Amino acid sequence: MLSTLKRFGITTGATAAASAKASVIYLFRNETPKSVTIPTPIGLRLEIPVDDYERRGEEYCATVTKFSGDNPDVLNGLKIVSCSTKCDSGIFIEGGNGIGVVTKPGLKVEVGEKAINPIARQMIIDAINEVTTDGVKVRIEVPDGEKIAELTMNKDVGVINGISILGTTGIEYPISDDEYLEHIKSEICVVKALGKKKLILAPGNTSFEFARKRYGDNVVKIGDRVGDSIRLAIEQGFTHIVLVSLPGKITKVASGLMNTHSKYGDARIETLTHAAVLAKLDIEKINKIANSATVTEAITYLLPEERKTLFSIVAKRVLQRLRKIVKNDVKLGVVIISEEGEVLAEEGEL
């Protein structure tokens, strides 16, 4: 049983969108609401408190605090400030102090640009559009961003001198908490009650949406808890389990990590390098993969057919790892997709 109801949080993208909307309201209406409501990419609307307002010459600024709910997060309590000024036309979003700079390829932001994810950027624009269609320039800054970034993995993925503004849904799920297993178990039981024998497990939002379109309503989002979720599924009597994932998390499973949270380890690049050797890629590409900061960067060095060959090897290794914890009478399948929804590999019984 859950000891408490679990609290969801908001992403840095949602926090920035709220501060941007509040600052624009202050700029155009001279109002300082205690909270603002913002749209999200998944259709939900979030009401988010605003901490403070401030005039800086011609700029109108608002501060919002990031809330991470019950998900352990070094960014919990982070202050994000947006400062707005009028301009002739259009909406211009720029990263200020405390927002990191992208230094390596493979991310969704170009090298040299401020680390504001495209989906988060669109969330900010959508929030502003609810206030005005006039021209406005918004600068987003994080007062302690550079210091706090040292506690994150930003440098490892090629973002320096600040944090990233991220988020695909605006909502931060408590996926790393032990009690989240109760949520997973409950959802597995719901699928069981539908009379399904095949269960689809998806770690994140993108893989979950892909799996729902492909398999229907027998999909459960599992976060980092791959091994535990498979164990729970078997306990509930499922005889066919398919794991659908983006390359990053599934590569961790291929390395033997059944909990993909960063605190348990990370051998993604090493695993991909090994797969590249098995795929007999040329030494130059193997070296590029071995020196990549992220899986996404490594993928950029591969031709389409090379990607499929490489991730077919990864998927087969995942099946080998899973088979060690699953009896032979349970069917297993693995589907690896890109962030754009391209199928990179399909192995096992699907």
UniProtKB/Swiss-Prot annotation:
Its EC number is 2.1.1.195. Keywords: Cobalamin biosynthesis, Methyltransferase, S-adenosyl-L-methionine, Transferase. It catalyses: Co-precorrin-5B + S-adenosyl-L-methionine = Co-precorrin-6A + S-adenosyl-L-homocysteine. Pathway: Cofactor biosynthesis; adenosylcobalamin biosynthesis; cob(II)yrinate a,c-diamide from sirohydrochlorin (anaerobic route): step 6/10. It is an enzyme of class 2 (transferase). The keyword Methyltransferase applies. GO terms for biological process: anaerobic cobalamin biosynthetic process; methylation. Signal peptide: none annotated. PANTHER family: COBALT-PRECORRIN-5B C(1)-METHYLTRANSFERASE (PTHR35863:SF1). HAMAP family: CbiD. Belongs to the CbiD family. This is Cobalt-precorrin-5B C(1)-methyltransferase. It comes from Sulfurisphaera tokodaii (strain DSM 16993 / JCM 10545 / NBRC 100140 / 7). The lineage of its organism: Archaea, Thermoproteota, Thermoprotei, Sulfolobales, Sulfolobaceae.
